[in-house]
Amino acid sequence: MAAQSLYRRYRPQRFSELKGQEHIVRALKNSIVNSREGHAYLFSGPRGTGKTTTARILAKVLNCDSPVDGEPCCACPSCLAVQNGNSFDVIELDAASNNGVADIREIIASASLGSPGRNRVFILDEVHMLTKSAEAALLKTLEEPPTNVVFVLATTDPQKVGETIRSRTQHLQFHLLQESELEEHVRWVLADAGLDVSPETIEAVVRQGAGSVRDTLSALELAVAVGGIAEEATPVD
């Protein structure tokens, strides 16, 4: 079996593990603790800042058997199913390649079905890539959402998402991390993984990561593989 990449190995499984997005963690946990979850969210921000990861954590806690203070337990069957990517309650769609009205109608039909868990969560990535007709089909469902259905729309370009869609979602904006935050995270990953690299390598991968946890860990993995500072790292989607 191939070894997991550092990014996948250290992908956050709880809100508390997310780096540099405290404002989003606070908003989501408060809404869950107070039972004021939205039926539709728009997560926007640069690539590699945790939008899809946060959506999956939200899906976990909304279906968790034993949530604690707005966090998923990460141990119940529902949480494990989401973590393993085989949950019937969580449906993900890459709108960059599935952007037509037929794709959205399939999602809408699925939303009307019952769910084994408490909530059915639909995660639509790169939602700004939807066609106008697909957006119109989605809008109708957002205006009259089925019971116990939550939509999480993720995008790197929120201005390309129709205003009517944006107005019917809770918009949470993800930010790139500061270099100091990335350096702290890299040092923690190195210690936990039992890896040793030079301070110059840490500085280089943080610089290459340019604020993205995903790109930083991809650069770190390449640097470890070649035994030193990687001059250029290829981003991983």
Language-model segments: which ranges?
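P-loop/Walker A NTP-binding region and its immediately flanking N-terminal helices
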Residues: M1-H171, S180
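Alpha-helix N-cap/helix-initiation sites
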Residues: E17, E179, S198-P199, V213-T216
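C-terminal helical "lid" of AAA+/P-loop NTPase domains
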Residues: F122, R187, A191, T201-Q208, ...
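Short, intrinsically disordered, charge-balanced linker/junction segments flanking boundaries
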Residues: E71, E231-D237
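Helix-loop-helix "sensor" segment of P-loop NTPases
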Residues: L172-H175, E179-E203
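N-terminal phosphate-binding caps/lids of nucleotide- and nucleic-acid-binding domains
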Residues: A59, P199, A210
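Short, surface-exposed acidic/glycine-rich loop or hinge patches that mediate macromolecular interfaces
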Residues: G48, N98, L176-L177, D196, ...
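Short, polar/flexible loop-turn hinges at active-site or ligand-entry regions and domain interfaces
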Residues: S66, A193-V197, A230
